[in-house]
């Protein structure tokens, strides 16, 4: 697939035709969710945030809006929508949820479910000052280009795991966020 010419219709049909493969037991049982907000445009965008430098965990990192599932959430989808509203003022009613990707185990002990949703192009994003220092949009075709991600094998507590690294403008995209974007690319049939 030529990544430079990805339209929203191309993305939607490929996402809905190719179902994700879940092929292992989760390591973590605490639940969290992130919203992968796809901005509805002729050439769609991918909305990302940069976390506040004042946070205890993952300070300053590029991330999707999201967080832990709490007792008030009816589902992981509800948690992703709640967190997106809290972090960047995306109303849940403005998100057209189209599906989920397989859960990812985080190094902080959560099983994170990526929820894919389409959002309107004219939403007035408002970053939560406590959690988010920046909100930015990356062209989806660029985000899904697998050649932009570089592997790094990390050894922690005797185990090895691979993380992915990339840049977009001044933003360093890596770790779970880069891994989720790569999984989304693979889900829609982008070949390495």
Swiss-Prot record:
Gene3D superfamilies: Nucleoside Triphosphate Pyrophosphohydrolase. InterPro entries: CoAse, NUDIX_hydrolase-like_dom_sf, NUDIX_hydrolase_dom, NUDIX_hydrolase_NudL_CS, Nudix_NudL. It is an enzyme of class 3 (hydrolase). Keywords: Hydrolase, Magnesium, Manganese, Metal-binding. SUPFAM superfamilies: Nudix (SSF55811). One of its GO terms (molecular function) is manganese ion binding. Mg(2+) binds at residues 83, 87. One of its GO terms (biological process) is nucleoside diphosphate metabolic process. Pfam families: NUDIX. PROSITE patterns: NUDIX, NUDIX_COA. Its cofactor is Mn(2+); Mg(2+). Its EC number is 3.6.1.-. A motif (Nudix box) lies at residues 67-89. It comes from the Bacteria. Residues 29-160 form the Nudix hydrolase domain. HAMAP family: Nudix_NudL (MF_01592). Probably mediates the hydrolysis of some nucleoside diphosphate derivatives. Belongs to the Nudix hydrolase family. PCD1 subfamily. This is Uncharacterized Nudix hydrolase NudL. It comes from Shigella flexneri.
């Amino acid at each position: 697939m030529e990544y430079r010419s990805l339209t929203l219709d191309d993305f939607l049909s490929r996402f809905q035709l190719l179902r994700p493969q879940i092929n292992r037991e989760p390591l973590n049982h605490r639940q969290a969710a992130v919203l992968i907000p796809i901005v509805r445009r002729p050439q769609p965008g991918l909305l990302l945030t940069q976390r506040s430098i004042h946070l205890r965990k993952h300070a300053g990192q590029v991330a999707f809006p999201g967080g832990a599932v709490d007792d008030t959430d009816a589902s992981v989808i509800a948690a992703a929508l709640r967190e997106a509203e809290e972090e960047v003022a995306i109303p849940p009613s403005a998100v057209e949820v189209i599906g989920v990707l397989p859960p990812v185990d985080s190094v902080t002990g959560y099983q994170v479910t990526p929820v894919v949703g389409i959002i309107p192009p004219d939403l007035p994003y408002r970053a939560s000052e406590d959690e988010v220092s920046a909100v930015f949009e990356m062209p989806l075709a660029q985000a899904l280009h697998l050649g932009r991600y570089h592997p790094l094998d990390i050894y922690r507590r005797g185990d090895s795991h691979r993380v992915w690294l990339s840049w977009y403008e001044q933003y360093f995209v890596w770790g779970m966020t880069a891994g989720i974007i790569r999984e989304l690319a693979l889900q829609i049939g982008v070949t390495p």
